[in-house]
Swiss-Prot record:
This is Probable serine/threonine-protein kinase WNK7. The keyword Protein biosynthesis does not apply. Keywords: ATP-binding, Kinase, Nucleotide-binding, Phosphoprotein, Serine/threonine-protein kinase, Transferase. It catalyses: L-seryl-[protein] + ATP = O-phospho-L-seryl-[protein] + ADP + H(+); L-threonyl-[protein] + ATP = O-phospho-L-threonyl-[protein] + ADP + H(+). It comes from Arabidopsis thaliana. The gene is WNK7.
């Protein structure tokens, strides 16, 4: 009990500077932004267990799903950070996907002094002893990467991607988003920062020694405070000089002959260039080191399979959990009606569909991403307590529920029997979210009139009309009793004919009109009351089901 009280006590942010807390309540995110890139923002965070500051890297899921290149870089970075453990490679703690805020979060160690480029520009008067120490640490990290089987090529070594803790001169290699595992003798793709790219990179035929060339350019930047080839105005000019063997103008500014000699060793043609291990033996260099940490068991980011759908989906998976195993949606059988919940999040209409199938629980959430696409999250808890999440964009023009469902079943390695089930979930959600949505599969039997606001009025009007007809018939019987003559069709017909021949008085016509109005009012009142009773019944039913479900879901979260 004491432990649970402590945990609940830290769920609320401790101060206004805290914007977010991770699912394990271990890490907190502050307002302070310490770095920002094209797709990633880095905030200062804090590890409340170890009492240390951390870097909280955050990427918006919708941004990733619309840029396959950024998504691939993220997967590459997470995969490599998790697999690499070395004193000169940035330390990885944890990663997870936040379904609610639609972000990918990666916790790494914090470098209080920022990148080596920032640090060097801030501290211009630094003894060469310190520069040599930094160089040795970078090479030690590269040696580790290049010694993997198969070797890992960073492909974007530069001072912007090397980080430092200035209080004790600790340097580590980071930003592994462009790194690649060299499964063949030579890599082929052209990628990196032009100012730091080796000539062979432009020829699309290179190996790990391309990182050594980039390291040489880092050394040049550290001693001259200039980006290599800053005299060039664009990438084309840089390429022309590099391919022609022309060195950057800043190399002529290096006054120390030992430094010049060392940099030139790194910039030699690939066939003559020394490896990181060989350069570490150079008397020019020095040494330093540090320790590591172990990650928490948070839901894991999972690599999708190859294919067009894999390029626009993001998946995570959590380990089996005994509490997940006991989760119940309070649904009695496989063929039950799905629970549909409508909410409004900051002006955006959100729909959630929940349904059970043979011990597995499916929750599909969706909201309009823009006028052409819908952002969807499918969460599956299986009978063993394993939780899987898949985020994806549904394009209204080109996608169908069946096609997307088939792709998802393949990605999640589910049985083909789930294709129709998930397709029904998707179309039920879209019917409730998008006006006049044309379904791909039959879902009329699954849509309840009162389950969501978007379709509530249309379905409710239909139900009310039927109820109204029933009430009208009942009222006609109750308030317009038949005479004995009316019971006999022949007599009734004769009576009607006779009445038609008689000129009715104005008073009688007015009396009939008033009676008709009164009856219509009664019918309208009962129709409205019936609608209200139906609405209250559905609200009470949904509230009860949701209360039981949310209680179980909180245990999973």
């Amino acid at each position: 009990m004491e432990g649970s009280e402590d945990a609940s006590a830290i769920v609320e942010p401790p101060d206004p500077e805290v914007l977010e807390i991770d699912p394990t309540c271990r890490y907190i995110r502050y307002k302070e932004v310490i770095g920002k890139g094209a797709s990633k923002t880095v905030f200062k965070g804090f590890d409340e267990v170890d009492g240390i500051e951390v870097a909280w890297n955050q990427v918006r899921i919708d941004d990733l799903l619309q840029s396959p290149d950024c998504l691939e870089r993220l997967y590459s970075e997470v995969r490599l950070l998790k697999s690499l453990k070395h004193k000169n490679i940035i330390r990885f703690y944890n990663s997870w996907i936040d379904d609610k805020n639609k972000t990918v979060n990666i916790i790494t160690e914090l470098f209080t002094s920022g990148s080596l480029r920032q640090y060097r520009k801030k501290h211009r008067k630094v003894n060469m002893k310190a520069v040599k120490c930094w160089a040795r640490q970078i090479l030690t990290g590269l040696k580790y990467l290049h010694s993997q089987d198969p070797p890992i090529i960073h492909r974007d070594i530069k001072c912007d991607n090397i980080f430092i803790n200035g209080n004790h001169g600790e340097v580590k290699i980071g930003d592994l988003g462009l790194a690649t595992v060299m499964e063949q003798a030579n890599a082929k793709s052209v990628i990196g920062t032009p100012e730091f790219m080796a000539p062979e990179l432009y020829d699309e035929n290179y190996n790990e020694l391309a990182d050594i060339y980039s390291f040489g350019m880092c050394m040049l930047e550290m001693v001259t405070f200039e980006y290599p080839y800053c005299e060039c105005r664009n990438s084309a000019q840089i390429y022309k000089k590099v391919s022609s063997g022309i060195k950057p103008a800043s190399l002529s500014k290096v006054k120390d002959p030992e430094v010049m000699k060392f940099i030139e060793k790194c910039l030699l043609p690939a066939s003559e260039r020394l490896s990181a291990e060989e350069l570490l033996l150079d008397s020019f260099l020095n040494v330093n080191g540090l320790v590591m940490n172990n990650p928490l068991p948070l839901p894991d980011i999972v690599m999708p399979k190859e294919g067009s759908f894999g390029e626009r989906c993001l998946m995570s998976e959590g380990p089996p959990n005994a509490r997940n195993r006991t989760m119940s949606m309070n649904l009695d059988e496989d063929n039950n009606l799905p629970i549909v919940i409508s909410s409004n999040n900051s002006g955006t209409n959100c729909i959630e569909v929940r349904r059970a199938k043979r011990g597995n629980f499916f929750v599909l959430k969706g909201e309009e991403n823009d006028e052409n696409s819908v952002s969807l999250i499918l969460r599956i808890v299986d009978e063993n307590g394993r939780v899987r999440n898949i985020h994806f964009l549904f394009f209204q023009e080109g996608d169908t529920a069946s096609n997307v469902s088939s792709e998802m079943v393949e990605q999640l390695e589910l049985t083909d029997k789930n294709v129709k089930f998930i397709a029904e979930l998707i179309d039920v959600l879209l019917v409730n979210l998008i006006p006049n949505w044309k379904t791909d599969v039959a879902v009329d039997h699954l849509i309840h009139p009162q389950q969501n606001q978007s379709s509530k009025d249309n379905h409710q009007n239909g139900a009310s009309s039927q109820a109204g007809e029933s009430i009208s018939h009942s009222l006609s019987s109750d308030y317009c009793p038949r005479s004995d003559d009316e019971a006999n069709p022949t007599v009734a017909a004769t009576t009607e004919d006779q009445e038609a021949e008689k000129p009715g008085s104005l008073e009688e016509e007015e009396e009939d009109e008033r009676l008709k109005e009164e009856l219509e009012k009664i019918e309208e009142r009962f129709r409205e009351e019936m609608k209200e009773i139906t609405r209250k019944r559905e609200e009470a039913t949904m509230e009860t089901k949701n209360r039981f479900f949310e209680k179980k879901m909180q245990q999973v979260e």
